[in-house]
């Protein structure tokens, strides 16, 4: 027996906007309209559907990834800045915003760093 009933009503504008405020970093009116009429389950599936691994961050000077390079104290600060910029760009993409918001939550929860 579940403690909560499944919310089966279609989302209206207010509920769709609330969901997207909570699950992403904000949404445009167009994005909110995409979720109006969906059930909560369908909306959650849409938010989490884009789970393919993103391309790794690139060094803007060489346009090559540095992910598999040996660790370098001299380069660490520069690489951290590239990763931060790459991550912010991922957060701004509507397709991946829910995944990145969850990543931000867990990154803060487990207090991880570049290491």
Which residues make up each language-model segment?
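N-terminal accessory alpha/beta regions
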Residues: 15, 27-115
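Flexible, low-complexity segments enriched for small/polar residues
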Residues: 2-13, 17-29
């Amino acid at each position: 027996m579940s403690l909560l009933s499944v919310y089966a009503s279609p989302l209206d504008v207010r509920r769709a906007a609330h969901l997207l405020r909570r699950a992403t970093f904000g949404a445009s009116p167009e994005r909110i309209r995409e979720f109006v009429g969906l059930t909560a389950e369908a909306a959650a599936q849409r938010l989490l559907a884009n789970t393919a691994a993103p391309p790794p961050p690139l060094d803007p000077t060489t346009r090559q990834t540095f992910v598999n390079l040996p660790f370098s104290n001299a380069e660490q600060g520069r690489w951290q800045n590239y990763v931060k910029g790459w991550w912010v760009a991922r957060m701004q993409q509507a397709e991946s915003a829910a995944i990145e918001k969850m990543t931000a939550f867990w990154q803060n929860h487990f207090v991880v760093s570049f290491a």
